[in-house]
């Protein structure tokens, strides 16, 4: 797959909601192609998402920060 198109990644876990209004979902994805194939990373996703969905990532190096619980 060309780098211009992105890298497919499968959603394997939904971690939780984030963002000021809860409109962003943090998920763990397993990268399916490219040099990071098989790597599991955490990403933020806007819009509806379910376990098993395939996301196309523009790049696979950045990882979202862990959601911290409020006290």
Swiss-Prot record:
GO annotation, cellular component aspect: cytosolic small ribosomal subunit
Annotated InterPro entries: NA-bd_OB-fold, Ribosomal_eS28, Ribosomal_eS28_CS
GO terms, biological process: maturation of SSU-rRNA; ribosomal small subunit assembly; translation
Keywords linked to the UniProt accession: Ribonucleoprotein, Ribosomal protein
Molecular function in Gene Ontology: structural constituent of ribosome
HAMAP family, sorted: Ribosomal_eS28 (MF_00292)
Family as reported in the entry's similarity comment: Belongs to the eukaryotic ribosomal protein eS28 family.
Oligomer status and interactors: Part of the 30S ribosomal subunit.
Protein name: Small ribosomal subunit protein eS28
